[in-house]
């Protein structure tokens, strides 16, 4: 109550920030007449003037009003677009490291040019992060004209680009790319064997477009680079045959009474978490079936150490058969399982689920089974983006997740008011008893809109649902276009024309995101196609363009009069934010529009979270079939269910971060050490320190510290030094011929002898030649042991929750054991490097060069490298590297200079983004 009272007097934090920013907007507006008088050269010259002032110590904050005024003027001249005042406000929020929430159609791409230009003046690089390659390419080309006019360089970072082009892209003042590609480049830079092969040059400032999608939806799973592990093909096939012999249990047993099971079975499913669990009966049946098939010995337990991998494969097979469904979670295409991104509905060609799930689905569908992978490097988006000196982001829907942005990333959300208030009518949800009734009502609404010429966008949560609606529209004789994973190459064009009169467009969730739906259709695309037609004369082209513009004006007025774009959704998503994004496609920049959700009690969200409550209301009201309930209480009940899911997902992401923070601290140490090894001109000091530490451990096994002579085993020490470390010392003779010798002196003698033996080896080929060999040995040992360590951490984490049964805190146990594993890793590296350095026999520098090259080739030649990145569903999906992929169909495309540009412009790469790179 007191808080509300104070907010009324002083305004909210958001109001106060906007008030502060508007004062700066007034200063920028006051400069506009002066900048309008400048010639193009004088305006461009401002960039160098600003750089000089920064070099003399002036801050970016002090330059902000002038820099923003320059960008606005440049945009007016080059783009024929003037930044609105609210866009200047959004630009300030981004510059100050905040998240700017700007509604769809408010011009986020143009807003970003302001802080991008200002921060690029420092010369330390600005990374603009987008959700897909199409948007990265489009924005780099579109806004690149403005940056180039103002004297800044622009690069684009695409997957599978040659290293030299990637380096050029990162050296540019401004770099456009996707979140996954930035993260993978960071990991790859920490896997190189030559410092000159690194592509990134420090992480200075990032602006994340669609920040909610990248930092929240995709933050549950890490980016992973992996190589191929051993083949278990026969096991996946065998496990797939076991699954039909196991029966699903219905109902859940009460832990105290054991009651509640309506039909006993072998396993239970948890649809919320996508997990499967064997019951007591299930364990016994599984063991009996596996024994009968010869997979485990008769009478053996499923949890014997030798059978642990079988449990992993059995669970993967159960999940594949009962929780992952064809045409919803994946499609079968050209004999391969292709994952469907449930948020965007796109096909993720070449990507793979991890932990054996993908192979289990392949076995289920009877297609070729490809091998599992071993993790080479990984990082979560939370930890990658927190490496930047400054981070900001923009989206149409961030306010529902403002707490998470603040809690995890330390980012404040600023809600930017629209340039023109929204006129969209968001109608109450209509809830029907059955799916059939829901679809009938939705089709009737679509037909009504189509008959009067109002465009409709139908939003669905999966490909399966979009195909159901497409089929129903076909039966109803209503023409429509489908925008889902199966046609995503054309999605930007389809979305652009979705505002034409009478147009019906079906879209899976946010497919085609980043492209505005203009009422009356996008006339600019049609004009661009005309201008590219060389068969037309100038006069014909001008006449056709005039016709197009006149027709568009009529269409625009007609659609506006009919109420704008109508949004019809057939299911609520588990996140309110995704529903708001769908609604946000309508009513852009003050246009009219309307939206309605048609739901049924059979929908997944309703069934799991809100169905019983709404069903009780319907039963109480004695609703006849075909009648819908439409009331605020129902909509609020559904939103309450969505809040529960959002809270659960936040907890998952927060827990992921708490666990990954442990690995992150270790990752920083390893990567820092690795970079020091790559950059160091001489590694002698590091090698000497490792050898001294290592030999101290060896000596202490035979000659304990502060011990007397009777406790020493000098014969054992001499033997160990000679056989394992190639150090020959007559320690027994020395001790016998000496009156008094301490354990410390023994240690010093051993270390000195090892030092001399090593120096003699270095002397044979020269210190300079030996340094590169040392570098390869160190890097390869760090990499090999780090990979094994990542697998060990993964196994540790999978079972750590069981410590809770022993009244121990799993997170604390994980931290303690992870630290112990890391200590072992460092000791292992020291031992392996020292032993190799002491035992290697090198006769000539040519022989040494050969050995060095062989080690480098072995380190870089990991077979079938794949890149796993998250989708919004939280599952890990994997794309094969074009350079190393065993399956060409799964490989990404390397862009040749004369190939079509991947951005979809239709131009050659060298004439499009090749120029930017």
From Swiss-Prot:
Main EC class the enzyme belongs to: translocase
Coarse class of the protein's main subcellular location: membrane
Keywords: ATP-binding, Cell inner membrane, Cell membrane, Cytoplasm, Membrane, Metal-binding, Nucleotide-binding, Protein transport, Translocase, Translocation, Transport, Zinc
Cellular component terms per the entry's GO annotation: cell envelope Sec protein transport complex; cytosol; plasma membrane
SMART domains listed in its UniProt record: SecA_DEAD (SM00957), SecA_PP_bind (SM00958)
Note accompanying the cofactor annotation: May bind 1 zinc ion per subunit.
Coiled-coil segments: none
Catalysed conversion reaction: ATP + H2O + cellular proteinSide 1 = ADP + phosphate + cellular proteinSide 2
Residue sites binding Zn(2+) per the record: 901, 903, 912-913
Domain of life per record: Bacteria
InterPro entries, per database record: Helicase_ATP-bd, Helicase_C-like, P-loop_NTPase, SEC_C_motif, SecA, SecA_CS, SecA_DEAD, SecA_motor_DEAD
Record: residues binding ATP: 87, 105-109, 516
GO molecular function, one term: metal ion binding
BP term (GO), one: protein targeting
Subcellular location per the Swiss-Prot or TrEMBL entry: Cell inner membrane; Cytoplasm
EC numbers, comma separated: 7.4.2.8
UniProt topology in membrane: Peripheral membrane protein
Family annotation (PANTHER family): CHLOROPLAST PROTEIN-TRANSPORTING ATPASE, SECA INNER MEMBRANE COMPONENT OF SEC PROTEIN SECRETION SYSTEM
Family of this protein: Belongs to the SecA family.
Quaternary structure annotation from Swiss-Prot or TrEMBL: Monomer and homodimer. Part of the essential Sec protein translocation apparatus which comprises SecA, SecYEG and auxiliary proteins SecDF-YajC and YidC.
Protein function: Part of the Sec protein translocase complex. Interacts with the SecYEG preprotein conducting channel. Has a central role in coupling the hydrolysis of ATP to the transfer of proteins into and across the cell membrane, serving both as a receptor for the preprotein-SecB complex and as an ATP-driven molecular motor driving the stepwise translocation of polypeptide chains across the membrane.
Name the record gives this protein: Protein translocase subunit SecA
Higher taxonomy: Bacteria, Pseudomonadati, Pseudomonadota, Betaproteobacteria, Burkholderiales
Gene coding for it: secA
């Amino acid at each position: 109550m007191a808080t509300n009272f104070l907010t009324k007097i002083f305004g909210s934090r958001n109001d106060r920030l906007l008030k502060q920013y508007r004062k700066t907007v007034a200063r920028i507006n006051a400069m506009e007449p002066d900048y309008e008088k400048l010639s193009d050269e004088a305006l461009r010259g401002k960039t160098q003037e600003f750089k000089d002032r920064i070099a003399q110590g002036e801050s970016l904050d002090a330059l902000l009003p002038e820099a923003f005024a320059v960008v606005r003027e440049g945009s007016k001249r080059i783009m024929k677009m003037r930044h609105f005042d609210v866009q200047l406000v959004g630009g300030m929020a981004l510059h100050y490291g905040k998240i700017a929430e700007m509604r769809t159609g408010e011009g986020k791409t143009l807003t970003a040019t302001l802080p991008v230009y200002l921060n690029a003046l420092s010369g330390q690089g600005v990374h603009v992060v987008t959700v897909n390659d199409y948007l990265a390419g489009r924005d780099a080309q579109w806004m690149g004209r403005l940056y180039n006019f103002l004297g800044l360089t622009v690069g684009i970072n695409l997957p599978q680009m040659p290293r030299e082009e990637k380096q050029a892209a990162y050296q540019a003042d401004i770099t456009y790319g996707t979140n996954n590609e930035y993260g993978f480049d960071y990991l790859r830079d920490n896997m190189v064997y030559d410092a000159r092969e690194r592509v990134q040059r420090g992480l200075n400032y990032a602006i994340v477009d669609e920040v909610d999608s990248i930092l929240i939806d995709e933050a549950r799973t890490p980016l992973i680079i992996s190589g191929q592990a051993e083949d278990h093909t026969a096991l996946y096939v065998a496990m797939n045959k076991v699954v039909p012999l196991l029966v699903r249990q219905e109902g859940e047993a009460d832990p105290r009474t054991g009651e509640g099971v309506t039909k006993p079975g072998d396993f239970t499913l948890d649809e919320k978490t996508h997990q499967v669990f064997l019951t007591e009966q299930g364990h016994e049946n599984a063991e009996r079936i596996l024994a009968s098939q010869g997979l485990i010995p008769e009478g053996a337990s499923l949890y014997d150490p030798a059978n642990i991998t079988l449990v992993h494969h059995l669970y993967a097979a159960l999940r594949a058969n009962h929780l992952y469904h064809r045409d919803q979670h994946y499609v079968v295409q050209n004999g391969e399982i292709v994952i469907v991104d449930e948020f965007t509905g796109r096909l993720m060609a070449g990507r793979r689920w991890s932990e054996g799930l993908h192979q289990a689905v392949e076995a289920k569908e009877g297609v070729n089974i490809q091998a599992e992978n071993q993790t080479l490097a990984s990082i979560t988006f939370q930890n990658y983006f927190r490496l930047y000196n400054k981070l900001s982001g923009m989206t149409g829907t961030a306010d529902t997740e403002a707490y998470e942005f603040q809690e995890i990333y330390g980012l404040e959300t600023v809600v930017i008011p629209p340039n023109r208030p929204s006129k969209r009518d968001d109608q109450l949800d209509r809830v029907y008893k059955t799916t059939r009734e829901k679809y009938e009502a939705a089709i009737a609404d679509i037909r009504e809109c189509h008959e009067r010429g109002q465009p409709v966008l139908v939003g669905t949560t999966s490909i399966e649902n979009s195909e159901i609606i497409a089929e129903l529209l076909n039966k109803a004789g209503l023409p429509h276009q489908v925008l889902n994973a199966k046609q995503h190459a054309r999605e930007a064009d389809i979305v652009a024309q979705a505002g034409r009169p009478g147009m019906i467009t079906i879209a899976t969730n946010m497919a085609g995101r980043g492209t505005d739906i203009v009422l009356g259709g996008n006339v600019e695309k049609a004009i661009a196609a005309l201008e590219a037609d060389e068969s037309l004369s100038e006069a014909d082209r001008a006449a056709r363009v005039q016709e197009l513009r006149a027709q568009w004006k009529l269409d625009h007025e007609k659609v506006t009069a009919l109420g704008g774009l109508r949004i019809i959704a057939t299911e609520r998503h588990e996140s309110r934010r995704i529903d708001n994004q769908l609604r946000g496609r309508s009513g852009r920049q003050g246009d009219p529009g309307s939206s309605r959700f048609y739901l049924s009690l059979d929908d997944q969200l309703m069934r799991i979270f809100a169905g019983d409550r709404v069903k009780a209301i319907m039963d109480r009201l004695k609703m006849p079939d075909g009648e819908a309930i439409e009331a605020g209480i129902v909509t609020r009940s559904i939103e309450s269910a969505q809040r529960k899911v959002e809270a659960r997902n936040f907890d998952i992401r927060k827990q992921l971060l708490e666990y990954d923070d442990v690995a992150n601290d270790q990752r920083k140490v390893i990567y820092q050490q690795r970079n020091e090894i790559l950059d160091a001109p001489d590694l002698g000091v590091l090698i000497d320190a490792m050898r001294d530490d290592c030999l101290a451990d060896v000596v202490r096994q035979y000659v304990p510290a502060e011990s007397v002579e009777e406790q020493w085993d000098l014969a054992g020490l001499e033997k160990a030094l000679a056989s394992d470390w190639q150090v020959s010392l007559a320690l027994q003779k020395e001790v016998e011929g000496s009156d008094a010798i301490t354990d410390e002196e023994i240690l010093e003698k051993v270390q000195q002898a090892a030092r001399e033996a090593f120096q003699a080896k270095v002397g044979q080929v020269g210190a300079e030649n030996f340094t590169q060999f040392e570098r390869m040995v160190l890097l390869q040992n760090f990499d090999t042991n780090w990979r094994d360590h990542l697998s060990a951490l993964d196994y540790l984490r999978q079972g750590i929750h069981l410590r809770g049964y022993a009244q121990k805190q799993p997170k604390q146990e994980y931290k303690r054991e992870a630290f112990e594993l890391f200590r072992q890793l460092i000791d292992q590296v020291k031992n392996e490097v020292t032993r190799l350095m002491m035992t290697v026999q090198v006769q000539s520098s040519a022989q040494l060069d050969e050995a060095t090259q062989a080690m480098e080739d072995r380190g870089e030649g990991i077979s079938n490298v794949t890149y796993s990145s998250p989708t919004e569903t939280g599952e890990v999906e994997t794309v094969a590297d074009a350079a190393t992929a065993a399956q060409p169909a799964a490989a990404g495309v390397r862009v040749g200079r004369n190939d079509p540009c991947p951005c979809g412009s239709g131009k050659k790469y060298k004439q499009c983004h090749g120029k930017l790179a």
